Amino acid sequence: SIDWEKWYRAYIDVSYDDDANNIHYHYNEDSSNQIRFTEKSHDDVTIPMKIKDSTILPKVKVKYVEKDSFDEFTSGEVTVNSDIVELPNDAPPQ
């Protein structure tokens, strides 16, 4: 779970690349479909994603914004290959 005393916000960043069809898709802070956690949201969140081509596996990482300094920390990236994604050991940062 996230230590909300330390972190202001956490973003889930989802991307996938399909070079053959020149598709590059990316969730980010400025998009309308941004996925964002704050202390008001629950730690256990299910995020539905529909991917048209099941041969393209999305990659997921989490970006944390520190409360005091607004410094950003980005976790390692994992490839989604099942319904449940285990984030790397560096997420959330201590």
Regions found by a protein language model. Name each.
Residues 1-2, 49:
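Aromatic/hydrophobic beta-strand junction motif of beta-rich domains
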Residues 2-31, 62-64:
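Extended low-complexity, serine/threonine- and proline-enriched intrinsically disordered segments
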Residues 7, 14-16, 35-37, 45-47, ...:
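A compositionally biased, intrinsically disordered/low-complexity signal enriched
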Residues 12, 17, 28, 52, ...:
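Intrinsic disorder/low-complexity signal
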Residues 20-21, 31-33, 53, 66-73, ...:
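Intrinsic-disorder/low-complexity loop/linker signature
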Residues 22-41, 78-84:
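Solvent-exposed serine/threonine-rich low-complexity stretches and specific carbohydrate-binding patches
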Residues 37-70:
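Short Pro-Gly-centered beta-turn/loop motif in secreted/extracellular proteins
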Residues 75-94:
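Extracellular beta-sheet/turn segments enriched in Thr/Pro/Gly and aliphatic residues
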